[in-house]
UniProtKB/Swiss-Prot annotation:
Ribonucleoprotein recorded as keyword: yes
One Gene Ontology term of the molecular function aspect: rRNA binding
Subunit structure of this chain's protein: Part of the 50S ribosomal subunit.
InterPro entries: Ribosom_uL1_bac-type, Ribosomal_uL1, Ribosomal_uL1-like, Ribosomal_uL1/biogenesis, Ribosomal_uL1_3-a/b-sand, Ribosomal_uL1_CS
Pfam families reported in the protein's UniProt record: Ribosomal_L1
Gene Ontology terms describing biological process: regulation of translation; translation
Gene3D superfamilies linked to this entry: 3.30.190.20, 3.40.50.790
Protein name, entry field: Large ribosomal subunit protein uL1
Provenance organism: Desulfatibacillum aliphaticivorans
Record-stated family: Belongs to the universal ribosomal protein uL1 family.
Keywords, in A-Z order: Repressor, Ribonucleoprotein, Ribosomal protein, RNA-binding, rRNA-binding, Translation regulation, tRNA-binding
Keyword Isomerase attached: no
Length: 234
């Protein structure tokens, strides 16, 4: 691993590593410390007081960010008949069934999210080794296996994210772009925190949100005081 670049070291000086910021202040600081020439993504990392090795402490869910992620999400839908037409009308980028399966098996993967109607999962499930490792497999738990394809497409286009706690007990999720500004990012991160809080497992003991940090794609981490999250969560 190479040495940190000059711009990164300069951006680190704008962050007090010994301080845990309020949520809005942390977002403002992360924005101020961004330096890339492109519109960086603002990410949040939350260390939870859970042990995801135990099924009753798994935290997994979805959240529609009020202002979206700032990314143009390419949505693919596996469907037949009238559900194909419904998906196209809702704004899906790619819609089909066996033709799409054949295309994907041939190596094509130019989409970001996939939805499937339940009757298509017998076919789609056979592509688990292709779609699974890339996080593209439709899943009922995240609302992407459904007959209500219009709603699913609209939510993904509007900025619906899905997240899952990692083995170390950490959640990572994108909250939007630096260009959003701190206030819009605050709306997004508030919605995310509300969802995470609602998903707290009954088996989780002690402090739930143990540590939180936000960062831009290229910038340093900015710590948030977890005790202040309650001030923005409804």
């Amino acid at each position: 691993m190479g040495k940190p670049g000059k711009k990164f070291l300069e951006s680190k000086k704008k962050v007090n590593r010994d301080l845990k910021y309020g949520v809005l202040e942390a977002l403002q600081t992360a924005i101020e410390s961004s330096y890339a020439k492109f519109d960086e993504t603002v990410d949040v990392a939350v260390r939870l007081g859970v042990d995801p090795r135990h099924a009753d402490q798994m935290v997994r869910g979805t959240c529609v960010l009020p202002h979206g992620t700032g990314k143009d999400v390419r949505v693919l839908v596996f469907a037949k008949g009238e559900k194909e037409a419904e998906a196209k009308e809702a704004g899906a980028d790619f819609v089909g069934n066996d033709d799409l399966v054949e295309k994907i098996q041939g190596g094509w993967l130019d989409f970001d999210k996939a939805i499937a109607t339940p009757d298509m999962m017998g076919t789609v499930g056979k592509m688990g080794r292709i779609l699974g490792p890339r996080g593209l497999m439709p899943n009922a738990k995240t609302g992407t296996v459904t007959f209500d394809v219009a709603k699913a497409v609209q939510e993904l286009k509007a900025g619906k994210i899905d997240f899952r706690v990692e083995r170390a007990g950490i959640l990572h999720a994108p909250m939007g772009k630096v260009s959003f500004g701190a206030e819009k990012l605050l709306d997004n991160i508030s919605a995310f925190f509300e969802t995470v809080q609602r998903l707290k497992p009954s088996a989780a003991k002690g402090t739930y949100m143990k540590s939180i940090a936000v960062s831009t794609t290229m910038g340093p981490g900015v710590k948030i005081d977890p005790t202040l999250v309650k001030d923005i969560v409804k």
